[in-house]
Amino acid sequence: MTFGLIPIALAAQSFQLSRNEGEVKVTGTSTLHDWEEVAEQRNGSMAIDQSGELPSISSLSFTIEAESLKSGHDGMDKNTYKALNTNKYKEIVFKMGEVKSISPVVSTTNKYKVVASGNLTIAGKTNKVDLPFTLTVNDGKAILEGTKPLKMTDFGIEPPKALLGTIKTGDDIEVHYNTIWK
């Protein structure tokens, strides 16, 4: 029986999120202008079994250092950190619970549309979310890319304000991810 289990265990390939390639950014609007912040410090792991007709993702998790979100404007960054309560909550974390769907992209080999369900924790509040992405697996490398709309208030975050409330950030944000895993 032990021999039967070994190939199954070896079929899953582990991937680590590349910190130097790809990008994770958050975009939103305000009464003054649209804005974006890039996550400079992130890490994660993913396990994929490619032995079947479709790949099977057995685990996926990633973490963003909350104070690594950078807009290029110190004042905006400080407002973001205050809204995220980064003195208390240092990380933004996604941990997959299950893959809800996976299907091949017809025109491309090794490319799949995926919806993964899991827990997303921001500013200490955890919500179950569906994370849609396109997964490409080739030559020991995986590319995960997509966009997830969120509302700040769903995580107990009051959209930041500046200049005595005259500049207000919109509640709707989008997380854009184009990540490389090796």
Question: How does the language model describe each region?
Answer:
Residues 1-16:
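Bacterial Sec-dependent N-terminal signal peptides
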Residues 12-182:
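Low-complexity, acidic/polar, glycine-enriched regions of mature
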